[in-house]
């Protein structure tokens, strides 16, 4: 745990303790008696404040569970991905007057492109595969053929 996070946790615990101190004093103290009333010693009776202690215990357990879940979630999200596979991506550029250029790169999803090699004739592709390298046919001819 980092030093600032540890300081934050201890600060939160001390703040909760300071806020709960008046509640503890209220439960454990005797109520003052007035002159006209009969004074009852509350230490002799069973206190009816047991539900406050159970409620306080439940809140403490819930806070600890939430903290543990958040910590586990952070650790799970920050772990390195071992199952990420490297892929190869190829990009071809074809121009009217230029020959076909190929670029191959090894790509990892988490890191990005690792290795780039650019060679002009890396992938020899026959020219008839692409057809004539002229201007595209007009729209009317495409509509007639379909």
From Swiss-Prot:
Coiled-coil residues: none
Main location: membrane
Keyword entries, A-Z: Membrane, Signal, Transmembrane, Transmembrane helix
Signal sequence range: 1-29
Localization annotation: Membrane
Membrane topology of this protein: Single-pass type I membrane protein
GO cellular component: membrane
InterPro entries: TMEM207 (IPR039490)
Tissue: Expressed in some signet-ring cell carcinoma, especially those showing high invasion and metastatic activity (at protein level).
Taxonomy, superkingdom: Eukaryota
Entry's transmembrane regions: 52-72
Annotated PANTHER family: TRANSMEMBRANE PROTEIN 207 (PTHR36467:SF1)
Complex formation: Interacts with WWOX.
Protein name: Transmembrane protein 207
Source organism: Homo sapiens
